[in-house]
Swiss-Prot record:
One of its GO terms (cellular component) is membrane. The lineage of its organism: Eukaryota, Metazoa, Chordata, Craniata, Vertebrata. Residues 127-177 form the BPTI/Kunitz inhibitor domain. Disulfide bonds join 83-111, 90-115, 98-110, 104-119, 127-177, 136-160, 152-173, 186-214, 197-218, 201-213, 207-222, 233-261, 240-264, 248-260, 254-268. InterPro entries: Elafin-like_sf, Kunitz_BPTI, Kunitz_BPTI_sf, Prtase_inh_Kunz-CS, WAP_dom. Keywords: Disulfide bond, Membrane, Protease inhibitor, Repeat, Serine protease inhibitor, Transmembrane, Transmembrane helix. It comes from Mus musculus. SMART domains: KU (SM00131), WAP (SM00217). This is WAP four-disulfide core domain protein 8.
Length: 273
């Protein structure tokens, strides 16, 4: 039988004594003893390794979240709604107040209008807005369209903020607002029993903000528009077991970008694009 040698004694305490015996072999034994300073070095090395690994893991998670956020924002570049079309031929761009929709408050969008990018309500006609001087200190002469008097008028602009009814020249104001066709669809009037009546409007700008100049049973009148949102309604089912009570009558009755669609009864649905 083999015998263990006499252990050599050195100053210090063992960090973790270990003894092992292998069965079915020639019996032998050994002990492992780390000196105190070696144990401390091992602890420091292990702590350093785990700290480095944790730091790398946190860095990886941060970069992953950053990439996910960037890709998400790239997919959702625009808010719901449609900007008014650019109505002027611009030789010089005016100062822009935004770059993307997400620079604008609430549901406002960053739109190219009147030769500059600005935050606008996609559901408002800019030429129907009142004059707004803004809240800075400059004194600049600008032009706005007075929808009540149906003419372009000068006003003093402070140099920032304000709204989209703001033009550099009277000509720009006239070109952008005098003969604008508002968004939306005129309501359908019956063609029977038409009468000859004097027109109460000549174009959309003769009407209040949410009305258009529409042909009716009695000449042209200002009528509340049917707002038609972008996209197409989903296909109707071939057979309906029952017809539900209408939840809407037109697109404007539906929230956000949903449309009023026929699907076993009128209801608000997500459109197809």
């Amino acid at each position: 039988m083999a015998k263990c040698g006499v252990p050599q004694r050195v100053p210090g305490d063992c960090f973790r004594p270990v003894s092992t015996r292998h069965p079915r072999q020639i019996p032998s034994c050994f002990s492992i003893c780390f000196l105190t300073h070696e144990a401390q070095s091992l602890r420091a090395l292990a702590h350093s390794w785990w700290s480095g690994a944790l730091l790398l893991l946190l860095l990886f998670l941060f970069l992953s979240l950053e990439q996910t956020s960037t890709s998400y924002n790239a997919k959702i570049k625009q808010k719901v709604g449609e900007c008014p079309r650019q109505r002027l031929e611009c030789r010089n761009e005016s100062l822009s107040s935004c770059k993307t929709d997400f620079n604008c408050k609430a549901h406002f969008k960053c739109c190219q209008f009147a030769c500059g990018r600005k935050c606008m309500d996609p559901y408002e006609e800019p030429c129907m807005l009142p004059s707004d001087k803004g809240n800075c200190q400059d004194i600049l002469t600008r032009w706005y369209f007075d929808s009540q008097k149906h003419q372009c008028r000068a006003f003093l602009y402070s140099g920032c903020r304000g709204n989209a009814n703001n033009f550099l020249t009277k000509t720009d104001c006239r070109n952008a607002c005098m003969f604008v066709e508002k968004k939306g669809q005129c309501p359908l009037f019956p063609f029977q029993m038409r009468m000859e009546c004097p027109a109460s409007c000549k174009n959309d700008m003769d009407c209040p903000e949410k009305e258009k100049c529409c042909e009716s049973r009695c000449g042209f009148i200002c009528a509340r528009v049917w707002l038609v949102k972008t996209g197409f309604c989903p296909r109707k089912p071939i057979v309906c077991s029952k017809i539900d009570k209408p939840k809407c009558l037109q697109d404007i009755d539906c929230p956000l970008d949903e449309k009023c669609c026929t699907r076993c009864g009128l209801k608000c649905l997500k459109p197809r694009h």
